[in-house]
Amino acid sequence: MNNNNTTEVGLSPLAAVLPFALFVGATITLSFFNAVNINLLVAIGIVAILIGGIITKNSKGYWTTIFEYFGSKTAMTATLLWLIVGVYGNILKEGHIVEGLVWASARLETLNETFTVVTFLFSGLFAISTGSGFGTISAMSLTLFPAGIAVGANPALLGGAILSGAALGDRIAPVSDTAVIAAITQEYEDGGRTADIGGTIRHRLPIVLTASLLTCIFFFVAGRLLPQSPASLSSTISDEWFGLTMILPTLVVIALSFLHVNIFVSLFSGIVLAVLIGTTMGLFGLSDLVCLEGNNVSGAVVDGIAGMANICILLMVVVSLSGLIIRSGCMNSILSFMNRHIRHSTILAELSIFSMTAVSGILIAAVNTIANICIAPFVNSIGKQHQIHPYRRSTILATVICTFPFVLPYGGCMLLLLKGIEASGSNVSLQATDMFLTPFYPWLLLICSLTACFIRNRHNNETTDKTNP
């Protein structure tokens, strides 16, 4: 968290840890029962805070900490970003980017054994464009999946390709909640600034590109070896190529982010360009963005804000809960325990970060954003103590945290895909266990990320890189 004052405020360990433990425990339980709902999690978090407020012996210090972290720079930055991202992503969808990608895949006339490779790449491109793994899975399960079944692609591989593409965009899209949280929660040692989003994405590109290349190879080989589905003509393939023009705003946002242009300016530039392209080419009208009908207000802009509002509130609640652990001294106790085992080894510190992040991702696999928010303060504290560069911390956090929702049977992304396949009318019988190994990209990225913990580079620690990235 971006708070320079980390002085303990005399909170009892029980009052500090119990609210956080209640929230995490409830989230894990709901994950296993496939009953995760963001609004419910917000309610659970608020109840947990109130319980802590009742049992604390230092009421003033408790509530001061809650409100300070609730409105912290970390929480407010992510909130503003997500609201803008919600608008941006909805405008792209309104511009028929999904239909454009489906059109391109059909015109490429790919064979059934290579269609999974194309599905992975197009799903990844859509995820990078919108920054939404869930949105990608929802869109592609209703479009590319039935198109792939029509040309005879293996259903389990096809589902794995969609999950892999969604995971790809979740790691490197500047507008992804994963990329945002992984960057803005990791502070420099002086505590005065946090890692910039463009720099962190650029830092993990070698890992992501390596895993992506291996994924393409795996999908191609598996597509030739595994049984195929019966091919059939499909009426689901779209002829709307104009939607491909919505890729241009995405390229602008990515390019500006890499050039260290402020992320808010980058996103605004992308939104303006998307609106200009969409209205000029007749993809949508201004009334599709904001529409007033009597007492009702609708449109892509309004829906984009509404779609992000609850997750923003959840973020502020969880940040407040983690603030209690930091201010009570519990965080220092945890770090002291770990330091006795890590000692002065940077590699062991990074492996500890890797392991903690993996455990968090496994336990809270329903919504990776929540797992990311919960573990980020611990990653930040361990990294600062061992002078691990914020870029490197962010890379481990972003590449590891999102693996498990895409592969575990109770993972939110896996369950969403199954629902989308059922709704697509593809008449395919597919279980979550059938796709445990077929999302090649998350598994390969996990291996590449673990390997990177043993490889030194110029962004290994802050003492060897004092530049202002």
Give a label for each model feature.
Residues 13-26, 36-57, 78-85, 117, ...:
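Hydrophobic mid-bilayer segments of alpha-helices in multi-pass membrane transport proteins
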Residues 76-77, 89-99, 126-139, 167-177, ...:
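Short helix-coil transition sites and intra-membrane helix breaks within transmembrane domains
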Residues 42, 63-99, 292-332, 351-354, ...:
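Core transmembrane alpha-helical segments of multi-pass membrane transporters/permeases
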Residues 113-126, 152-169, 348-361, 386-406, ...:
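Alpha-helical transmembrane segments of multi-pass membrane proteins
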Residues 164-167, 171-236, 406-469:
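Juxtamembrane and boundary regions of transmembrane helices in multi-pass small-molecule transporters
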Residues 72-78, 103-121, 149-158, 239-248, ...:
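Membrane-interfacial loop-to-helix junctions in multi-pass transporters
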Residues 79-87, 111-143, 338-380, 397:
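Hydrophobic alpha-helical transmembrane segments of multi-pass integral membrane proteins
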Residues 58-59, 71-75, 152-156, 181-201, ...:
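Juxtamembrane helix-boundary/capping and inter-helix hinge elements in multi-pass membrane proteins
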